[in-house]
């Protein structure tokens, strides 16, 4: 019929009708083609959704913190910290927890909250919280969807010793840069911070020096493992899809532990140095900061890029002389957080997605104060330490404009830091350990090249980044403190394989540091 109509038109002389008809025919064919394509796409899309919804998932439980009474949560609240795929919370809104009591079992729905609440995120695995209020007389808690068994949760309670300021540092790995870590510990300790370090691997002598400081606590930070019974493919390693050694999980874990004890918690990297400006110590600084921003749950201090000089020889090293050598590069980078812990339940590296209602995240102006990011290191052969350098600190110059006449630290503080450090490393066993610190860096140059490639160059901004993508050789004979851990797997929870960290500890070895 269509061909007959076309033939009649061709015999006629009304070319306008011919043109209109051809246009209608083409439009009809295009519409049919689009409809067919959409139908095929819709079927494929439905298959993808069906396959995702139907498949099982893995979660790795890192800790469960129980708060009998809390400034942040209702009484008898438990908080599970775990890792899973970044869309896990879109598929599951709750985890089912069975509380065993003397009167019988009680089921409690723990609400799932993503720590990094943005999709898509460049790492496939991210941290989560699951929060629920349990019976006061519970004997144990277990993750379960049946009445027979379950994965018993290893409960801990938060720290209770009051701390005005706690510094939760990002996890240390392959750590040998003693010039940095010793300075960080001395400076943060001087200004009143209690420091919590998470360690995956570190040279043993440096580990002992840090542990000796009364203002530090060190916890092992394990790479995560999923068992042979799993939803993921046998070759999949979730650590390659966790951002920077699972850093956001470590920071949130630290927040959960000090929620009831600390008035302020700051979350720096070890190469981020903050010197108080609004007060003589961190407590006064942060008190004033939150007075400036009364609605803040978190205040961001941006980082200003710097270069510094130091010595490879312990006898010539000075932490405050290193700071006095600082040169500002005029560049500002991503900020780091200070929080009021009762106002924030979790944190990412540069922001918190879990600030309680009524509060917000605010940014401290750089010209008021900022972290010194000790980014570029130089090790000249000429000794860097001299008293005149300590007594002549450079001016604070984040924009490289010579716009301020404010020294980066007070001379009296610098002299006290230097004196305390020298006293600590010149007595007893610490003197011997300090003298053994390495004069050659093995890991740092390799990590620096790797991180410049995968992170600072910004070439692969859309991919997950971490040390697992660095090629690090073994160094036999190098004494390191590494982490040993044990995980167990529970496979009877509906659609979820649960892998839980049940023990972790430090172990010394002489075959180098591991990831």
Swiss-Prot record:
GO terms for molecular function: glycosyltransferase activity. The keyword Membrane applies. It holds the Pfam family Glyco_transf_92. The chain crosses the membrane at residues 18-38. It comes from the Eukaryota. InterPro entries: Glyco_transf_92, GTase_92. The keyword Transcription regulation does not apply. Keywords: Glycosyltransferase, Membrane, Transferase, Transmembrane, Transmembrane helix. Its EC number is 2.4.1.-. Residues 163-456 form the GT92 domain. GO terms for cellular component: membrane. It is found in: Membrane. It is a single-pass membrane protein. Belongs to the glycosyltransferase 92 family. This is Glycosyltransferase family 92 protein F59C6.8. It comes from Caenorhabditis elegans. The lineage of its organism: Eukaryota, Metazoa, Ecdysozoa, Nematoda, Chromadorea.
């Amino acid at each position: 019929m269509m061909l007959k109509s076309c033939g009649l038109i061709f015999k006629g002389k009304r070319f306008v009708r011919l043109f209109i008809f051809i246009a209608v025919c083409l439009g009809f064919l295009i519409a049919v083609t689009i409809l067919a394509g959409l139908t095929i796409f819709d079927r494929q899309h439905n298959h993808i959704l069906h396959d995702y919804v139907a498949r099982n998932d893995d979660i790795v439980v890192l800790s469960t913190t129980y708060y009998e009474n809390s400034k942040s949560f209702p009484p008898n609240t438990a908080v599970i910290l775990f890792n899973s795929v970044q869309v896990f919370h879109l598929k599951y809104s709750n985890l089912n927890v069975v509380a065993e009591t003397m009167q019988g079992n009680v089921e409690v729905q723990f609400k799932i909250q993503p720590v990094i609440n943005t999709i898509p995120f460049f790492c496939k695995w991210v941290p989560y919280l699951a929060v629920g209020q349990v019976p006061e007389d519970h004997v144990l808690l277990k993750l379960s969807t049946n009445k027979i068994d379950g994965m018993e949760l290893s409960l801990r309670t938060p720290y209770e010793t009051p701390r005005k300021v706690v510094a939760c540092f990002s996890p240390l790995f392959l750590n040998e840069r003693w010039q940095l870590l010793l300075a960080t510990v001395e400076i943060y300790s001087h200004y009143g911070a209690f420091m919590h370090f998470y360690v995956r691997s570190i040279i043993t002598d440096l580990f002992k020096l840090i542990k000796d400081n009364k203002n530090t606590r060190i916890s092992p930070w394990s790479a995560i493992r999923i068992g042979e019974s799993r939803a993921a493919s046998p070759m999949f390693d979730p650590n390659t899809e966790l951002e920077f050694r699972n850093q956001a999980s470590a920071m949130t874990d630290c927040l959960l532990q000090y929620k009831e004890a600390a008035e302020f918690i700051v979350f720096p990297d070890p190469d981020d140095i903050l010197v108080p400006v609004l007060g003589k110590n961190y407590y006064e600084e942060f008190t004033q900061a939150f007075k400036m921003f009364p609605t803040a749950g978190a205040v961001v201090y941006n980082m200003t890029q710097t270069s510094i000089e130091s010595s490879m020889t312990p006898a010539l090293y000075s932490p405050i002389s290193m700071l006095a050598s600082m040169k500002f590069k005029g560049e500002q980078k991503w900020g780091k957080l200070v929080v009021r812990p009762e106002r924030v339940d979790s944190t990412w590296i540069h922001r918190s997605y879990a600030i309680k209602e009524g509060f917000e995240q605010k940014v401290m102006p750089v010209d008021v104060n900022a972290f010194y990011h000790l980014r570029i290191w130089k090790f000249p052969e000429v000794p860097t330490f001299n008293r005149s350098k300590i007594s002549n600190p450079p001016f604070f110059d984040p924009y490289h404009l010579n716009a301020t006449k404010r020294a980066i630290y007070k001379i009296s503080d610098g002299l006290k830091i230097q004196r305390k450090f020298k006293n600590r490393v010149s007595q007893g066993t610490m003197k011997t350990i300090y003298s053994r610190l390495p004069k050659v860096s093995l890991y740092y140059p390799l990590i620096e090249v790797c991180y410049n490639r995968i992170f600072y160059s910004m070439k692969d901004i859309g991919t997950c980044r971490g040390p697992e993508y660095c090629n690090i050789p073994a160094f036999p004979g190098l004494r390191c403190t590494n982490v040993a851990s044990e995980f167990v797997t529970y496979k009877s929870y509906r659609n979820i394989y649960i892998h839980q960290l049940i023990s972790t500890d430090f172990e010394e070895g002489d075959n180098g540091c591991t990831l």
